[in-house]
């Protein structure tokens, strides 16, 4: 299964760009990065994603969750009381994860990767 070049979530198109390891990690010291200004883009360490293992899934899901945080404006939950804040944040994250798993072009890649993890 080929890794998609873009996904659509919540009506937004998000570019998925695989970067050479030297650029991703050695230069910027990160395995992935979400850019919230248009065009929305998630940069991922190509070497890590191509391994197709637990770390690959973790990095991918981590960066998609940055989009969820941005899209559902979770930075604004500071104004809510603790119980309301927690419920809004957890519900938003759950909605974003379900959308990523069921409604994006990442679904097949994620399922294949999960099946192949030993």
Task: Give residue ranges: language-model regions.
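Metalloprotease/metallohydrolase-associated module, dominated by Zn2+-dependent proteases
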Residues: 1-54, 71-118
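Active-site recognition of the HExxH zinc-binding catalytic motif
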Residues: 58-70
